[in-house]
């Protein structure tokens, strides 16, 4: 077999349809778009427009709201903290603060604080000082012999 003998399987590719190339092509003049109207013009149809029928996004009820002054936390899981300790990027002997997490590269920015969640396992005894932590994360750290100091009461829940 040579490179110039390579071919697609018969029927694997369809020939391109050249529309608007005269009546003999079967797709001449209007090119399969029908006559006049918004959809016959160039440009795409309006997104969400359903031909005058009440669109889906308007048929469904409005729900919820966005809190204007919502606090955003950098989320850290216990499994990742353990991984960074094993890799030597975090020192378990020192108290682990938000600044230590930032310096180690575990979080990119502090935002409104750091919140620790319990995904993964922690086996090393650590002393955490963070803005918030889930109850299960606090339990897991204390079970490993460590302690968690939560600096903000709102974020603890």
From Swiss-Prot:
The keyword Ribosomal protein applies. Keywords: Ribonucleoprotein, Ribosomal protein, RNA-binding, rRNA-binding. This is Large ribosomal subunit protein uL15. It comes from the Bacteria. The gene is rplO. Binds to the 23S rRNA. NCBIfam families: rplO_bact. One of its GO terms (cellular component) is cytosolic large ribosomal subunit. Residues 1-41 are annotated as: Disordered. It comes from Dinoroseobacter shibae (strain DSM 16493 / NCIMB 14021 / DFL 12). Belongs to the universal ribosomal protein uL15 family. The keyword 4Fe-4S does not apply. Part of the 50S ribosomal subunit.
């Amino acid at each position: 077999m040579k490179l110039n003998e390579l071919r697609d399987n018969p029927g694997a590719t369809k020939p391109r349809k050249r529309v608007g190339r005269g009546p003999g092509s079967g797709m001449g003049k209007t090119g399969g778009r029908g006559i006049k109207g918004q959809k016959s013009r160039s440009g795409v149809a309006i997104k969400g427009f359903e031909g005058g029928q009440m669109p889906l996004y308007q048929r469904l009820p409005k729900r919820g709201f966005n809190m204007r002054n919502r606090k955003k936390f950098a989320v850290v899981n216990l499994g990742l903290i353990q991984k960074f300790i094993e890799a030597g990027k975090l020192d378990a002997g020192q108290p682990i603060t938000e600044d230590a997490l930032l310096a180690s590269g575990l979080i990119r920015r502090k935002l409104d604080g750091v919140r620790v969640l319990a995904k993964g396992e922690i086996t090393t005894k650590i002393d955490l000082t963070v803005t918030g932590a889930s109850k299960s994360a606090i339990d897991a750290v204390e079970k490993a012999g460590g302690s968690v100091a939560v600096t903000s009461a709102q974020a603890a829940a």
